[in-house]
């Protein structure tokens, strides 16, 4: 049996809460998350807008300090002092969803990619490093792009420049927040193929944050489904997406164009993160509970009153659902 590699980056019971206004309770944006990403692995973090996935990504990047729990990178707890954080951010790079907003319209492609090198005091051949990063990102020959400005590039080329700006520092892990959301469908596949190639060639790890389970299917090794600040289902992507166990995962999958049957329409909106309901945090919108299936399984009361707990974030398929556990 092949031993499981230790996580390169892991969240350990991470909480991120924001103070409420005018004495209101704190908003629990991330409410106890365990998540691990190994070397050479792509993990998709999936959920609706407002579920806490971007806040979790910011905590993993060191952009916001957890209010509970912690982040471990390469076996060492993440420190939030200036020097330690600067060294960490060289090894873990962010790729944003909107390349137009990420790139200064006045800067050339060369300057945009070289910016990270200058911030981190790179002492080698800057031009060679920029050329190598652009080439790895699929902009060849790289010298053709040095003096271009963002408005002279297509959307896909701009996203490749953003990726090159991350690659130039030779990171070990990318955090990509909706990396293809702003791109035309014809270009999305090219960027996803690029991320897969970088994983294979460089053993580069990635956390891909997305609302799109279809994207997760195409790129990820593992998937973590997030709802109201918690991971509610996680595991190898093929197992989770072909045989989803949590009602929320099932609902997200049901609206994909290729999904069989009728889409599951969830009623209402996710609860306010400052007023997380007792029991399963999904129970107020759960079609299994509303349809009587949880009652027939003898778990309806548990759904309403008992927290399913925090998933451990390991390689196995895990689900935070009383009904799924009873089946």
PLM features: residue spans?
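ABC transporter nucleotide-binding domains
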Residues: 1-242, 325-327
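Short catalytic/signature loops enriched in Gly
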Residues: 5-7, 26, 234-327
């Amino acid at each position: 049996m092949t031993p499981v590699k230790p996580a390169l980056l892991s969240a350990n019971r991470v909480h991120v809460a924001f103070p409420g206004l005018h004495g209101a309770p704190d908003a629990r944006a991330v409410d106890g998350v365990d998540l691990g990403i190994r070397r050479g692995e792509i993990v998709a973090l999936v959920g609706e807008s407002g579920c806490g996935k971007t806040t979790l990504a910011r905590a993993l990047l060191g952009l916001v300090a957890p209010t509970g729990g912690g982040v471990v990178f390469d076996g060492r707890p993440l420190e939030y002092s200036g020097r330690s954080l600067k060294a960490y951010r060289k090894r873990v790079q962010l790729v944003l969803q909107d390349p137009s907003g990420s790139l200064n319209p006045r800067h050339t492609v060369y300057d945009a990619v070289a910016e990270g090198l200058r911030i981190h005091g790179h002492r080698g051949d800057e031009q060679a490093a920029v050329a190598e990063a652009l080439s790895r990102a699929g902009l060849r020959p790289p010298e053709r792009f040095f003096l271009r400005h963002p408005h002279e590039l297509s959307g896909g080329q701009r996203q490749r420049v953003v990726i090159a700006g991350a690659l130039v520092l030779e990171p070990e892990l990318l955090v990509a927040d909706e990396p293809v959301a702003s791109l035309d469908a014809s270009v999305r596949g090219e960027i996803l193929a690029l991320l897969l190639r970088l994983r294979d060639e460089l053993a580069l790890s990635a956390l891909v944050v997305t609302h799109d389970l279809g994207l997760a299917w195409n790129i990820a090794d593992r998937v973590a489904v997030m709802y109201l600040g918690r991971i509610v289902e996680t595991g190898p992507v093929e197992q989770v997406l072909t045989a989803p166990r949590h009602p929320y995962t099932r609902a997200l999958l049901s609206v994909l164009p290729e999904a069989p049957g009728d889409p599951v329409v969830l009623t209402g909106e996710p609860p306010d993160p400052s007023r997380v309901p007792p029991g399963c945090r999904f129970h107020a919108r759960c079609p299994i509970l509303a349809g009587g299936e949880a009652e027939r399984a003898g778990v309806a009361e548990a759904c309403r009153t008992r927290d399913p707990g925090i998933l451990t974030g390991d390689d196995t398929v895990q689900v935070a659902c009383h009904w799924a556990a009873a089946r």
